[in-house]
Amino acid sequence: RLAVDPERFPDDNQEVMATKGMGAVYTTTADGRALRHPVSPEERTRLLDTYFHPYAKAFEDVVARILDRHGRCVILDGHSFSSTPLPYELDQQTERPHICLGTDNFHTPELLVRSIQALCVAQGLRVEQNRPFAGTYVPLRYWRTDPRVRSVMMEIRRDLYMDERTGAETPGLPRMRE
């Protein structure tokens, strides 16, 4: 994600995070500092053509193969998040869940959300939907057009398994692996 974020819309006019310098082509860091010099339209096109579009095409191809073979595809979009809000984040509330489930009204069935929530709650984890992050990745070829493609984003709060300052694993890591 230092150069390009393949989970963003390639058109900054469609991508809310572009206002934070974190659209398809990143121009700022998580703490709001400049990541690079201003990106020219030509350089942006080169970055998208070199990294974004090949990734998107490869992901689309995998989804197409799964659909051909099974008739449906479930994407589990895995991420982690800081225990305290970072400057770029739209949600600055300090009380954060253990698990964030990002959903899309078209691609995330309620049964999938309820099932994941139940598994997490049974482990004593606090789960919120679309908070502090919202949405989930679906290749643009299928986005809001093909109901056979299901997707949910699952974000795990980092302090549950690592020391956020050093990156060292903590005793909570085995529990999160489970």
Identify the function of each model-found stretch.
Residues R1-E178:
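N-terminal catalytic or cofactor-binding beta/alpha core of small enzyme domains
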